[in-house]
């Protein structure tokens, strides 16, 4: 998703100048089983046994909707969203006898959708039309007041990045999936960066004091590490010593995993009936 947005913004032929971020209200809770079964019966009418299986699984939901965290539920919601995304891309306007798409490009992650185009008015029109169609077809509503971004040109971003005052160097960007994406660089979302920085600073003090980090922090360090490698955060990574601390965290996780497997294989574990990965002894 992040890389796709970067490619769209850097392709001059698309002429993208604006972006709007949309979010579906209570997406999984409002996606009903009847809507999903209607789509599946339309797409695969001959797969009767598969339809019965999916319907039986959906009936296990207490409210008759999708459940957050379910593997099948995630794919079924993506199926519903594919119809919404294709409808957005199909919206057009006619100017001087030629058809022009309102949405030039879009990306989606779960219930977050980012639409990009040449005019902000086109994006607003597409959002209103798609919201009405989605509510009528699937019973899903978009949250009002989505974020709107006006991207700067590559030259303007380079000029701002070399200003004297650090506070004036910022550029507007699209905030999606934990990243803030511009044309020439990408940063981490402020709230995520604050939590990641806090964990690496604490880990640095623990490494200086005892030479290792506790297991619970090792998991956090490993999960936050990708935000630094996938963004323009080289100087910050050097300051936080991520390249030194992250391998140490992986060693701690590996040691804990081997200990768990050893206890499990020696039948000293009360959860022995399950797989080693599900063992909760440590």
Task: Please annotate each region the language model reported.
Residues 9, 22, 86, 93-97, ...:
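Right-hand nucleic-acid polymerase module
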Residues 3-110, 114-135, 171:
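Conserved polymerase palm-domain catalytic core
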Residues 139:
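Arginine/glycine-rich "motif VI" loop of SF2 helicases in the C-terminal RecA-like domain
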